[in-house]
């Protein structure tokens, strides 16, 4: 039975009074469980009342949205929308991962990077140099010139109180080199040349007018200025010497050897004479020349060793006394014009000429060490004087250990 418009309006779709099978209508009151696209900003859209039934077309669309995946929903929205702006807004709301990736900055090559670093360093250096140049040209920190002294006419100069010295600037101050203390002492004062005093009755000259002074011959600075001690100059006292040749050293040793040999022979012959020994030749061969043959007994060998030890001690005593008390020279060195001086440092100045520091006289301790090493090295079958061939300035091993050097007696200066 057909229903009128009023009755059809009062019942929801799918329901009638007669009963029977009816198709279920999905409810649209609750929100859908699946993701829905981002709503469009439409100012004319009005919210739907919760009790008002929806149209059949909307119910079918909602049922289809539940079954369609988001990708198909996006394709459907793109097909339905014809505006480019709405498509970009929907794509940005539904799939933000579809946005275009950001462009990375281009990587510089090694050559381009080096060029930019070099340019930056050059700009930094120019700025630093400009800053210091501007500070140096700034005259605010320059020390003022002292005011000229005035003297009364016809009278002597009136002594005035000395002006206080200008403040010294620290080395870290950029104006340090402008201070008078950084310029060093006056060369005329260092050389011992006094500044002429002003004449009474004459006023001072203008600062821009220079007095004409006749140049006078000046002797060496060392003669004009008083001699300074090494502690004042800050340098160690030294002296220049000439290094003797190997021939001079050898001849001096030979002279000392013959002198000591005659002393030894004199002592041995005196002992023989006092002992009443008749066989002088055999005794002399054993104890003077120290020759051993097949007839030498063990007792004679022991006596020879005792005599050799006494002889070495005599030689040590001879060199200790001569080098310590006789001006640093044995008779052989004295005849050849040689002497022994202390040497902590030796600097070569010219060929065969060295600066010896401190070049003082040899003490008794140094002389004892030198003599013992020299003589007992020979007794141990190692002649230490051969080492002068290997060390600088013809120094031997005992010279280096004792801190001495053999030079010519007359130094250069």
From Swiss-Prot:
The RDD domain extends over 242-408
Subcellular location, record wording? Membrane
Q: What span is annotated as the signal peptide, if there is one? A: none
Q: Supply the source organism's classification.
A: Eukaryota, Metazoa, Chordata, Craniata, Vertebrata
Q: Which GO terms describe its cellular component?
A: Hrd1p ubiquitin ligase complex
Transmembrane is among the record's keywords: yes
Record function comment = Plays a role in the assembly of the HRD1 complex, a complex involved in the ubiquitin-proteasome-dependent process of ER-associated degradation (ERAD).
Q: Where is this region: Necessary and sufficient to interact with SYVN1?
A: 107-139
Q: Can you name this protein?
A: Protein FAM8A1
Composition skew (Low complexity), residue ranges = 49-64
Organism equals Homo sapiens (Human)
User: Compositional bias (Basic and acidic residues) spans?
Assistant: 1-10, 65-78
What topology in the membrane does the UniProt record assign?
A: Multi-pass membrane protein
Keyword annotations from UniProtKB, A to Z: Membrane, Phosphoprotein, Transmembrane, Transmembrane helix
* GO BP annotations listed: ERAD pathway
Q: How does it assemble?
A: Component of the HRD1 complex, which comprises at least SYNV1/HRD1, FAM8A1, HERPUD1/HERP, OS9, SEL1L and UBE2J1. This interaction stabilizes FAM8A1 protein, preventing its proteasomal degradation. FAM8A1 binding to SYNV1 may promote recruitment of HERPUD1 to the HRD1 complex.
State the Pfam families in the record.
Answer: RDD (PF06271)
Where is the PTM Phosphoserine found along the chain?
229
Q: In which tissues is it expressed?
A: Ubiquitously expressed, with a higher level of expression in testis.
Q: Which domain of life is it from?
A: Eukaryota
Task: From the record, give the transmembrane residue ranges.
Answer: 257-277, 304-324, 371-391
């Amino acid at each position: 039975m057909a229903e009128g418009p009023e009755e059809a309006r009062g019942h929801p779709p799918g329901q009638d009074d007669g009963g029977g099978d009816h198709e279920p209508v999905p409810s649209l009151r609750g929100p859908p469980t699946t993701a829905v696209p981002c709503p469009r900003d439409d100012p004319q859209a009005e919210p739907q009342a919760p009790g008002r039934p929806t149209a059949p077309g909307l119910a079918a669309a909602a049922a289809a949205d539940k079954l369609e995946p988001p990708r198909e929903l996006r394709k459907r929205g793109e097909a339905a929308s014809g505006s480019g702006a709405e498509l970009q807004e929907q794509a940005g709301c539904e799939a933000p991962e579809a946005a275009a990736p950001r462009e990375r900055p281009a990587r510089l090559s090694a050559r381009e990077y080096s060029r930019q670093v070099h340019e930056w360093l050059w700009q930094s250096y120019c700025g630093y140099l400009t800053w210091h140049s501007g500070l140096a040209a700034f005259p605010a920190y320059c020390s003022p010139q002292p005011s000229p002294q005035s003297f009364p006419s016809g009278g002597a100069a009136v002594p005035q109180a000395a002006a206080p010295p200008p403040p010294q600037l620290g080395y870290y101050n950029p104006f340090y080199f402008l201070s008078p203390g950084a310029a060093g002492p006056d060369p005329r004062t260092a050389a011992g040349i006094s500044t002429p005093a002003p004449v009474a009755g004459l006023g001072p000259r203008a600062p821009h007018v220079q007095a004409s002074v006749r140049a006078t011959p000046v002797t060496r600075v060392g003669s004009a200025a008083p001699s300074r001690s090494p502690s004042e100059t800050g340098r160690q006292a030294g002296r220049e010497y000439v290094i003797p040749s190997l021939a001079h050293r050898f001849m001096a040793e030979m002279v000392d050897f013959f002198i000591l040999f005659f002393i030894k022979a004199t002592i041995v012959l005196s002992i023989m004479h006092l002992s009443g020994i008749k066989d002088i030749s055999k005794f002399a061969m054993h104890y003077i020349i120290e020759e051993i043959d097949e007839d030498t007994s063990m007792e004679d060998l022991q006596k020879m060793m005792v005599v050799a030890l006494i002889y070495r001690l005599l030689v040590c005593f001879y060199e200790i006394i001569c080098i310590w008390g006789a001006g640093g020279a044995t008779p052989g060195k004295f005849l050849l014009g040689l002497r022994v001086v202390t040497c902590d440092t030796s600097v070569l100045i010219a060929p065969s000429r060295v600066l010896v520091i401190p070049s003082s006289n040899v003490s008794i301790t140094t002389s004892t060490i030198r003599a013992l090493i020299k003589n007992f090295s020979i007794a141990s079958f190692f002649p230490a004087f051969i080492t002068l061939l290997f060390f600088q300035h013809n120094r031997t091993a005992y010279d280096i250990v004792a801190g001495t050097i053999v030079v010519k007696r007359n130094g250069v200066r």
